[in-house]
Amino acid sequence: MEYKKLFEPENIGKCKIKNRIIMAPMGNINMADPIGRPSLKMIEYFGERAKGGTGLLITGLIPVSYGIDPTVSEDNDTTYFPRIDGSSRTRLSGWRDLTAKVHSFDSKIFIQLTAGLGRVGSPEPALKGKILKSASINKNFYVPQLPHFPFTDRQIKKIVKSFGQSAVNAKVCGFDGVQLHGHEGYLMDQLTSNPWNRRRFGRYSNKFQFAVDVVREIKKRCGEDFPIIYRVDLTQALKESYGDEIFRKRFKGMERTIEEGLEFCKVLYNAGVDAFDVDKGCYDNWFFPHPPAYFEDIPYVKEIAGTLKEYFKKEGIKAKVIAVGKLGKPEVAEDVLDKGYADFVMLGRPLLSDPYWPQKVSEGREKEINHCIGDQEGCIQSFILGGHPCCTVNPYTGFEDCKKVEKASVKKKVAIIGGGPGGCEAAKTAFLRGHEVTLFEKDNMLGGQLIAGSKIKIKHDVERYIKNLNYQMNLLKEKGLDIRYNCEVKKEDLIGKYDVIICANGLSPFVPQIDGMDKIRHIEAREFLKSDMSLPKDVKKVTVIGGGVVGCELAYSLSYEKNVDVTVVEMLPNLMTGVVHSNRSMLLWLMMGLGSPTGKKEDVLKNPIKAYTSSKVIKFEENKVYINANRKRKDPYTPWHTLVPENIHNPFDKKLNPNDVEEIIIDTDYVIFSTGGKASDTLYYELLKEKAAKEIYAIGDAKTPGRAWEAITSANEVARFI
């Protein structure tokens, strides 16, 4: 397929960009030193995407409100964000190095500036005695019991001035333009939107005024030709997400409608904005601005970017429109441009999983793209838990400064047992380093546990990743990598024959033994998925034991694809504990019957999933599951609310009395156990005991059951070391 539109040059203002591919603002957090100066890690991270052929890169979040919004800084005035505000020459030196690196590859780079976090900032400052701030009195997103109080007009004007100073600093450092983050419910969105700005007096009771003042201040300081992109939600889509209920529970003001969003963009264009990165949603429905694997491709690009583009054409507005939202398939991105929905496409996660996406597409090597799987564990969850952006399927993302594939000084014979994502990463990396590698896989396809997960419709991103993974590994096989399919290995096959053995043979499912299991039909979740979710014909009601992400994905898919009644039972206080907010909230939203993967109302569940948390299965009888459920268990369905990371103390989160339970009987025809697994480490310990090779390693689930992220990361570390 030809990609004429993708690789056409285009302008934003007077800034000419070599193609229509823009890197979304992902990165930065914890990629700077404690005073906010960009580190080598950040420079190499963006440099790699420039090398890969991206036309325009946009940095991640850079707040300008230090000393005003307490959520953007930490103790002793340190920060996990980079900084460009004020007049520090020390900070500016790092930014100059970054722009020089990007420009070396004929890419452009804009800096993303934001007013701050406001109500979506960490509650920790309040727990240390500081006063949290927002546009009006608003609840903290993480701990709703904590209030944010309104900024004064004077404080807001100070933020406006800081935008101007930060932008001119960026211009001096070589940035080609600025992007303003007025989306997702961050402070700039709070000051310009009805749900959060309910000011009745003063300059900023006008919802558009703050954004207009910021744009004019930047143009005044940097000149009219210095281009500005405004990142905007055409609507917060809260009513679309939850109906009227959320307004009673969380907000006092109504959302921005699409009609108001169009008017807002017109006002911003007249103020001087050159392009709009247009999206929908906010933190309270984070699955829209950060769409997980569960959404189909471009679920709302036509509705949002296409609507704005059509409006601009009608009004004679010359600003460019940038489309965003699951555009990782090259043919989909080209189609969006070809149909005129947008002037540019913005890629975030696709460029984290494969920085060379543009180059591969331009050279007709689409099958070699390392596709994003939409789990968002590396790109988002990592920095929420204190790390920096990285990627599940690309172990070099965020580590470009320190992880290199270097030729081994001594060639070794390497055996790898298991062709899951970890085993494949180990095989690929060791082979590229010059080792003689044999990969043993017991099935006829590579992919491991991900293959079972890809059997359900909402995991089509994983299916695409596995398809390309097998293609890429077969290319290496043609070059000499020995891959042996349908080959189950015993210790006798390995002892004394290899210099290095890497056990990547996964896990064994765990099914708890519960009284009465012989009285009810049951199966383990992974076995059920491998059977293509084949249910006995008489089954109308299914109970899933285990409300982790696998259990909830399976429960939803049973109702969505098989139209059966499903109940989930989970021992912990919440469903999907530890899962990134956007993915968790979307799956809850789907399970509640409030939305669909296609975005179409007709695809919403007819039978929403019933769920019991803080509940334990005590016995089975024929067609019945008996559980003890805590009487004060939480409502399992609050997708607009995230779970506070366990390292942040929440004084309002009270523990339940484990003895305060009621017995509930669930009618069911079939039980599926989604209760995790245990490491398949028998072979590993046998090999160690026999001293089967000089070097023996266990990686991924064969060491500790976990996510694909841990498996691929540990595989890469070992393979670069041997």
Predicted regions and their residues:
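Glycine-rich FAD pyrophosphate-binding loop
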Residues: 435-451, 565-576
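A conserved FAD-binding loop/helix module that cradles the flavin
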Residues: 554, 579-580, 699-722
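A Rossmann-like FAD-binding core segment of flavoenzymes
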Residues: 464-510, 517-540, 560-686
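Hydrophobic Val/Ile/Leu positions in short beta-strands of Rossmann-like dinucleotide-binding domains
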Residues: 416, 439, 544-545, 568
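Residue-level detector of alpha-helix initiation sites
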Residues: 177, 327, 420-422, 445, ...
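Rossmann-like NAD(P)H-binding beta-loop-alpha module
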Residues: 419-432, 538-564
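Internal hydrophobic alpha-helix adjacent to the cofactor/substrate pocket in enzyme cavities
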Residues: 354, 360, 556, 560-562, ...
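Flavin-dependent oxidoreductase catalytic cores
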Residues: 1-417, 421, 425-437, 509-510, ...
